[in-house]
């Protein structure tokens, strides 16, 4: 039996007898060749540009995945002693494609059966063994078509970006619309004009004084008071409402607060309502809720969920269906009744159906595995950290989905104050909500993204018992100013939601898209918010002007629907690819669109006027402000051109004309000599660079002179020699740990100040602690538990467990050339598109396998300590025969 991962193989092996040998392919064993790796003899053929022959049925050129030669040899060797082959890869498109590639490469001479399951339990595995099927060729072709169209899109458009904007940029079928959404939201924020308004709130007491409550002014003589929702995004007031400014609001508050004014309840209305539980998780809703509740990225969520699935704790994590099987419904209802009481369970089983048209993903929601769900408490000794938190989230959501509606009662009271001194009557309103029956709320409550102009005072609360005509006493009255807020930036959760609502992408792609747009430098994260970089504005503007249809949301969604039709066998893949690439009567194809880009001035493409005199430009080394002044004047070149750096932390919507002028008007930071280092006799210089101000020891013989960045709390204008020498002395040795004999050093990094002892780090609270903390203070920090420490500073950064091939313990470390993974025998560099934080164990094992393959080493064998290098190993490649039946 062949599965994708060692962890999955290990779990399944527990449920099968000795007659089965369960092996892992560790992901794909064959992939579409990168164009740069196309063999020489094919470079000048139709395969040369894309590794896809677009002139002959879009035939792809496949090659063995790096590091998989040994895996293939092992699988072939195992097949020799087998009398049957079960392909047990995942049940989605990707899993079906892996199974097909295994067949193509292994060419088994024994009977082959395809088995699928959505959870790894003994019962599910046995059920899958009893109900095998043939390979789904439509699914395979759908995956292949997606891979080809993504290759055509990326490799046709990206080179245009290199020529017109900058090298290293990339475009993607789903990636580019995702970036466009983020950029468009930032454009809305940049165009937004904030408006000011006031409201008046009062705190009333009942006559008995038993309970006070807050109410908000709603009308004045019947005219509604303006709130944040009454302004458009340009700050214009809409609707027939009364706008209170500071003077009128203060005068009104004073009038309400005068003694002798009549205050009485004019109406009390109670409205019962019910709240239904949320549906069980799909891939996208799991990513959204894990982001909101657990602060996990989409990739962290998927990696954690994959681990839970492979260990047999949850069902398959890539699905767009919220449906539960009858077995799962029974398990959820039974557990809800046991833990929360029989009356907490819905009268009848709840059946959820999905809205997605994509019929080719897994067909059940993400839920705890098995006929009886394990409670989080039962797994508390087995699951830890993110794994436990995510399992608990899934368990709660699943159980709650079969529980009864919550019953809620909302009471709204209207209170009349007046007549006031001018004869007008002010009407206040107060609402209180109480839960009369908790139902599913006993287990779980869904989170939501924060709304714009949200009034925190209207949070749920309980009102005292009030009656119409009842007199009240005024406790206090306050006038408060407010500013309307711009549209909120996307978070990973809300961006996934937007993509899903627009029909862009599929469950299996969202996590990769979130990671890619950040890794490729188009988007950064500020807390949970996604902030576009200026280069994203440049790229999206260029794509909108030249490839508008290709990044149009509706067009991208229609492509997804077409690809689903291919999976259903309703569309011919080759005909569809031909229409997409070469075009037809109804549209210009990608090929002609890319080839007919008009000549454009690169400076114009990369320019954004901030004012008539100030222009923002995106360059090779990032964004900057350009102005022209008197040639030869301070900061200007002979043509009068002056460059002003933009602070790295300044978001695009914060670069207003006023802010740009402030940056231009700021004192010019010039390089200067601060003095002489008494220890070396070399000058200490102050400089201002792309990443901010720094000091440098001007050693003419040093290949890389010693530097030190200024702390955020330091001013370039007041930096002196003493402070500069302190910066150049870092890292500072605080003292020696008496237990280990290791030096403890204090230093500053990208994520702030920290201590380092050997391979162990601890964060410091403030930058000045770097110079002030003593040995006793440092030892006290190390005596405290380490909570989510600095991954980039500590070594090892992560532990992945035992490598299934070498048996070594795999860890992630950082070295002179960046992060890498090691099993104690071999080190493998972590590619720039991967991150240590989000890396799964299987990915770490795969990198080590590829490295061993490249070095020609067996698992557990270390490289010879010599400078000699062996001959470069050539990866065998195969071309899928045209029209070959799968």
Segments predicted by a language model, with ranges:
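Basic, low-complexity terminal or inter-domain segments flanking catalytic cores
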Residues: 10-11, 18-20, 158, 191, ...
């Amino acid at each position: 039996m062949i599965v994708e991962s060692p962890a999955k193989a290990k779990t399944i092996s527990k449920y099968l007898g000795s007659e089965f040998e369960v092996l892992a392919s560790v992901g794909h064993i064959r992939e579409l060749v990168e164009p740069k790796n196309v063999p020489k003899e094919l470079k000048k053929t139709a395969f040369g540009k894309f590794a896809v022959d677009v002139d002959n049925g879009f035939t792809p050129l496949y090659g063995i995945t790096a590091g998989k030669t040994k895996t293939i040899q092992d699988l072939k060797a195992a097949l020799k002693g087998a009398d049957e082959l079960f392909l047990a890869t995942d049940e989605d498109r990707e899993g079906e494609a892996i199974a097909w590639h295994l067949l193509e490469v292994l060419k088994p001479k024994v009977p082959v059966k395809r088995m699928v399951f959505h959870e790894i339990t003994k019962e599910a595995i046995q059920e899958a063994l009893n109900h095998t099927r043939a390979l789904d060729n439509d699914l395979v072709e759908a995956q292949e078509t997606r891979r080809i169209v993504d290759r055509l899109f990326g490799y046709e458009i990206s080179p245009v970006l290199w020529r017109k904007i900058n090298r290293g940029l990339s475009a993607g079928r789903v990636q580019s619309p995702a970036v466009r959404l983020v950029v468009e939201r930032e454009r809305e924020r940049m165009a937004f004009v904030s408006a000011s308004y006031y409201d008046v709130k009062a705190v009333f007491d009942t006559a008995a004084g038993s309970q006070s409550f807050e109410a908000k002014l709603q009308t004045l003589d019947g005219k509604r008071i303006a709130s944040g929702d009454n302004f458009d995004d340009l700050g214009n007031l809409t609707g027939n409402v009364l706008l209170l400014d500071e003077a009128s609001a203060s005068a009104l508050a004073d009038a309400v607060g005068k003694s002798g004014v009549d205050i009485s309840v004019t109406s009390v209305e109670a409205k019962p309502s019910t709240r239904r539980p949320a549906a069980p998780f799909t891939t996208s809703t799991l990513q959204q809720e894990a982001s909101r509740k657990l602060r996990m990225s989409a990739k962290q969520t998927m990696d954690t969920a994959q681990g839970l699935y492979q260990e047999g704790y949850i069902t398959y994590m890539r699905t767009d269906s919220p449906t539960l099987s009858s077995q799962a419904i029974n398990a959820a209802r039974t557990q809800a009744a046991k833990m929360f009481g029989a009356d907490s369970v819905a009268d009848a089983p709840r059946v959820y159906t999905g809205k997605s048209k994509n019929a080719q993903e897994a067909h059940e929601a993400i839920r705890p595995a098995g006929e009886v769900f394990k409670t989080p408490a039962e797994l508390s000794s087995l699951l830890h950290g993110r794994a436990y938190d995510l399992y608990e989230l899934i368990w709660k959501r699943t159980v709650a989905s079969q529980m009864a509606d919550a019953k809620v009662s909302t009471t709204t009271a209207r209170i009349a104050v007046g007549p006031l001194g001018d004869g007008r009557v002010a009407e206040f309103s107060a609402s209180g909500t109480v839960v009369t029956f908790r139902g599913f709320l006993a287990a779980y409550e869904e989170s939501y993204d924060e709304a714009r102009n949200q009034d925190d005072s209207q949070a749920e609360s309980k009102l005292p018992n009030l009656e119409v005509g009842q007199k009240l006493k005024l406790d206090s009255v306050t006038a408060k100013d407010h500013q309307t807020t711009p549209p909120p930036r996307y978070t990973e959760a809300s961006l996934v939601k937007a993509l899903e609502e627009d029909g862009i992408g599929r469950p299996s792609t969202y996590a990769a898209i979130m990671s890619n747009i950040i890794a490729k430098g188009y988007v950064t994260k500020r807390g949970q918010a996604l902030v576009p970089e200026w280069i994203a504005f440049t790229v999206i503007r260029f794509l909108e002007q030249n490839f508008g249809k290709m990044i149009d949301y509706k067009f991208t969604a229609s492509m997804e629907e077409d690809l689903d039709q291919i999976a259903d066998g309703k569309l011919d893949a080759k005909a569809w690819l031909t229409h997409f690439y070469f075009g037809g009567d109804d549209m210009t194809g990608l090929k002609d669109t890319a080839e007919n880009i008009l000549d454009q001035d690169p400076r114009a493409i990369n320019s954004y006027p901030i004012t008539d005199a100030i222009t923002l430009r995106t360059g090779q080394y990032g964004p900057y402000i350009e102005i022209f002044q008197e040639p030869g004047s301070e900061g200007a070149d002979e043509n009068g051109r002056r460059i002003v750096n933009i602070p790295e932390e300044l978001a695009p919507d914060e670069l207003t004309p006023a802010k740009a002028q402030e940056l231009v008007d700021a004192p010019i930071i010039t390089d200067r000599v601060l003095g002489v280092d008494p220890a070396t006799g070399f000058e200490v210089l102050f400089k201002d660079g792309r990443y901010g101000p720094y000091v440098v020891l001007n050693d003419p013989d040093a290949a890389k002179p010693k530097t030190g960045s200024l702390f955020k709390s330091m001013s370039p204008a007041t930096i002196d020699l003493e402070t500069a020498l302190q910066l150049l002395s870092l890292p500072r040795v605080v003292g020696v740990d008496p237990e280990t004999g290791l030096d403890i050093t204090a230093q500053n990094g990208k994520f702030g100040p920290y201590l380092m002892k050997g391979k162990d780090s601890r964060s410091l609270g403030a930058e000045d602690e770097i110079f002030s903390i003593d040995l006793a203070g440092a030892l006290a920090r190390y005596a405290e538990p380490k909570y989510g420490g600095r991954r980039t500073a500590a070594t090892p950064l992560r532990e992945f467990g035992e490598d299934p091939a070498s048996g070594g313990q795999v860890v992630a470390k950082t070295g002179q050339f960046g992060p890498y993974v090691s099993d104690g025998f071999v080190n493998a560099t972590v590619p720039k598109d991967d991150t240590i934080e989000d890396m799964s164990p299987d990915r770490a094992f795969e990198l080590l396998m590829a490295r061993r393959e490249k070095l020609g080493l067996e698992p557990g064998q270390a490289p010879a300590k010599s400078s000699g290098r062996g001959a470069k190993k050539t990866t065998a490649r195969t071309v899928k025969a045209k029209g070959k039946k799968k």
